[in-house]
Structure formats: C-alpha cells, structure tokens
Amino acid sequence: MLFNGFRARRMVVVMGPGLRRGDRKMSPDLVFILTLLLRMAVTAAFVVSASIITERSGPVIGALVATLPISAGPSYVFLALDHDATFIANGALASLPINAATIWLSLTYVVLAQRHSALVSWGAAAAVWIALAAASRMFQWTLAGGIAANAVTFAICLPLLDRFRHVRMPLITRRWYDIPLRASLVATLVATVVTLSGWVGPYISGMLALFPIVFSSMMLILHPRIGGKPTAAVVANGGWGLMGFGIGIAVLHVATLRFGSAAGLCLALATCVSWNLALWWTGRRRLAH
C-alpha cells in the first residue's frame, strides 16, 4: 500500500498541471527569437524583390522603387504589432524631420560622388545625416513643424539635384553577394528597431526606422562598380520620391491617431505608392511629348 501510495503520488507529480506533454509551453526568450527571425526573413524577402526590380529598371524607376518604404515599412509594421497606436503616431512624428535629413544625405553624396570615392562620398553624407538627426532631438516636433522642415528642405535640395539626374547608365553586373548583403542589412536594421523600441521609446524608434539603409547600400554597392556619376544619378532621381515618402509619414501620423495603426499603415503605403506611380506616369507623358 505504501508503495502504491508513493507511486500514485509520484504519478500525480509527473503528470500534474503544467507538466503534461500537451501543456508544455515554449520559453518566452525562444518565442521572441523565433518571432524576430521570422520578421527578419519577411523583410529580407521584401528587400530582395525590390532590389531585383531596382537593378533591372534603370535610374528613374530604380529610384522610385528605392524611395518606397522598403525598410521603414516593415519596421513600422512590426512596431505596430508590439505597441499601441499612440506609439506609432509619435514615432511617425519623429520620422518627419529625419526624412528631411535623408534628402540632405542624398544631396551631399550626389555632389561628392562626382569626384570622390564611394567611401568618402557616403561617409560625408552619413555624417551629415547623423548630425541632422542628432540636432532634430533638440526640438519638440509638431506635425506642422515637421511638414515645414520637409518643405524648406525640398525647396532647396530638389533644384540642386536636378542637374545630376540625367546620366548615361552603364550595364550593371550584379555580384552574387549584392542582394543577400542588402537584405541582411535591412533585416538587421528592422531587428534593431523592433528589439530596442521598448527601451528607447517612440521617438528614437521613429528615427532609427528611417535610417537610409537602402540608399546607403545602393551607394556602397553601385558606386565602385559603375562609377560615382551613374550612382549619383540614381540617388538624385529619388528626390521627388522622398517627397512622397514624407507625405506618407505625415499621413501615417494623422491616420493612426484617428483610425488606428492598421488603417494608418495602409493609408501611408497607399500614399507612397500612388505618389511614385504619379511620378512615373508624369515622366512617361513628358517623354511621349
């Protein structure tokens, strides 16, 4: 009886609640890692598709694809899965002046790439972006202030970029590591934004989400291969696309506050795509006439 009683109690312990085979739960750390890897894989697949389109379409279409939310879009989608609508709206507000910083990065690179190496041109452009991003933290941004910063920036930079847009493009020979490298860089950025968002808050997350990783990888990969002027032409053609991207960020802020994160993200994406399609259509009509 004692043996049977001990055995019975032992069976209760072994088969008790929480320890049955069907009730075993995955470790929270493992769930986080697997979820993060899945998000990185989805982002990488998105970047690979966009990169193939960019390389096969010439400087104008390539620039329009590059200015779609290829890296910022996945970052914000995954942030929306982890945070509420207020977080996303505040992040978008912080992203507005960063979009202005990106056009200054583009102008700096385009000017320097005419005569200097990829590392020098990109390094100086990245330094400008970092300085402007750091300076933006000194201000309490509003929607009107962010829009004004973009309006002034584009009014200055777009005319200066225009003279660099038209260059004969050489044949681009792709290396086997180009797209995997670009995809891994963007996936790493998304992973960094998602992982740090809980600690750094919406404003830093919004800044990090707009780090110009797609433009940077394009500069560093294409410049040594086809030269500074053709690469600068691709970047210069992206100026008008960045304007639409800025409008999309403003739409994200307003729509998220009114309708929630899902609707805000969809409307922001629709804004960016519609803007770039309008640019493409306008360009085709000009060529036709």
Protein language model regions, located:
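C-terminal ends of transmembrane helices
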Residues: 46-58, 103-117, 159-170, 219-229, ...
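Cytoplasmic-side transmembrane-helix entry/capping segments in multi-pass membrane proteins
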Residues: 60-69, 116-127, 145-151, 171-183, ...
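A generic, lipid-embedded transmembrane alpha helix
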Residues: 66-82
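Small-residue-rich transmembrane alpha-helices that serve as helix-helix interface/gating elements
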Residues: 151-153, 212-213, 263-277
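Transmembrane helical segments that form the transport core of multi-pass membrane transport proteins
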Residues: 188-226, 232
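Selected transmembrane alpha-helices and immediately adjacent juxtamembrane segments
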Residues: 58, 164-203
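Structural signature of hydrophobic alpha-helical transmembrane segments
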Residues: 31-43, 65-66, 84-101, 143-153, ...
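Hydrophobic alpha-helical transmembrane segments in multi-pass integral membrane proteins
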Residues: 79-80, 134-141, 187-199, 245-261
